[in-house]
């Protein structure tokens, strides 16, 4: 657990409001130190499920727990006992569920919303605090970094205004979490669709777009779409080594 700076008290009868930020990606920690921990209050950063200990969190009495990017289930006891806020890359109720960025891009979506919502026992179904426009251009890692800075600005507004979240309206559309096998390139219909497929998987911790051919495994990253061609970095390994 990383202890952040202590900012201004925010007028809560002389006490420092306590906030916890959880994030499992390196850019989450970077934005926490660059931006979030400088906001008013006492701040702690958590990056592993072991640190998200119910007893430890309860002893902190946090006003909010913010989840920037989290790959594990949050204990129901923690969600029910504290105001937990997650940031989801869709205009909910559309796009609840897993792999939102990849599911949006593969559907041809170029602009979405970053939604701050209260976590409940039903995934991505809780009431909404804020929505902000989010551009989905660039590679996946660039988009995740962009979204994290946007989330930091939304956190600032939430702790300042303490808005009451409002229930989602409309019919829910559920996204299924993608698997590593689905990163295989299979007959894209156009050069643009191939470019989108490569870039949507190009982030640390994600299985990159690949093809297997003639005993070799080809992984693609850093794609750029030019007129009539794609230029990309390719990492080639022996297929036997990849499978082992």
Please give the residue ranges for each predicted region.
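One-carbon transfer enzymes
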Residues: 1-244
